Amino acid sequence: SNAYTKYHMNEVKVFYQKEDMWDVAHQIYGTKEKQMSSSFFIFNLPGEKKAEFINMIPFTPKSKQNMTAIMMARNDGDEYGKLVVYKFPKNKTVYGPMQVEAQIDQNSEIAKEFSLWNSSGTTYKRGDMFIIPVNNSIMYVEPVYLEASNQAIPEVKRVIVAYGDKIAYASTLD
């Protein structure tokens, strides 16, 4: 996927002038920003009749935070190894993972809870963010773990879901 950040360009001029470079999207993992790893899903690709096992990675424009594309690697049967790339229109802003992370940080209820957890002898850590295409849009799902200072095993405390401009969080997805 790192090679694709440069080699997705089809026009010679755009390629040589590096006008459309991409980055693999970033997220907050634990408490620090890092490049996202690919996620594995069982998912119905658009136009396909049955769900299949896919590997997915999101891209943002170089040094920007909005999402520009998602690459999916197919892993089932005759489709094994085929790559499918969904590019978002340049005239439509699709929030990238770090923009969603910022929305989470700006949510007063969530921020209050994070503060409380950090001051009571425990620390919260964000897990891997999942990016799920839904109805021509993107839904983000991120688990939040609570880790006691004397315990090595973190506990899932909340699940945050973001869709469009809306953010919800609860102890489960139910």
Label each PLM-derived region with a short phrase.
Residues 1-174:
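Accessory, solvent-exposed terminal regions and/or long lumenal/extracellular loops of proteins
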